[in-house]
Amino acid sequence: MNYCDKINYNIYSTEKAGFEEMVDKLLAQLPRDKQIFRLAFFGTPSDNEQYVSRRILLREKVRKYYGNHEPVLTYVSQPPLNGGLLLEAHMYTPDEGDHITYKHIGTFPYVLLENGSGRFLFAGGFHGDVINFGIEQQSKEVFKLVSDLLRKEGFPINSIIRQWNYIEQITKFDGEDQHYQIFNNARSDYYAMTTWENGYPAATGIGANLGGILVDLDAALFSNPDCYTTPIDNKLQVAAHAYSDGVLEAAHCKKTTPKFERAKSMTFGDRELVYISG
């Protein structure tokens, strides 16, 4: 079966109730016949102290629920459109050619998939100390975590094909420095450690009410010549990584551009999966 048929994304919601009850109801909706790679919860904590305590509770519940098959866990402080808590699940239906390993780096779970197409990494929930540090320090801490994981598993930086970046109060300024630009500068510094001949990742870079800096990513190393990635841009738009200084805010007198493509496709033989940025 083709990778495009085996990977699956779904959204689950539940009506407003106590936080623990909502988490239990969402976990109970997840299918038992699939491998769960990523769980991204979206909710509305009242402050960062409650955000951290709920993130810890989520981790405990997910670990108890999945045991040695703990998926990537992300908690985003954004109000769901409907219901009290929303869950985005990334799932996979393996066949005999797939080898799936659930691992940890520090306290962060991640998933490795290996098959005839290549090696695939699903990771995230990467965050810094949202209580005691600002956006700049958190951004540096997050990319240090990303770097450590990629190095550990043998994935080059430019193997990242999709990245999700959630930034607390994204347009807010710390003095003269905008949160989004602070994050962009940290990302640019990290990405500058390699070359990107095949384009930057597709990416989400959006605001969150709370939670500091939060990053998820997918990476791929292909071993089959019929499998590859292709960057996609819109000719009616300026590429994000080519923005002029006029549309960027400065942070520490730096105006590095957002490093992402409008989309990126993964080809598997005669099939394609497209990651759309936004």
Where are these regions (language model features)?
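N-terminal presequence-like segments and the immediate start of the first folded domain
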Residues: 1-164, 169-278
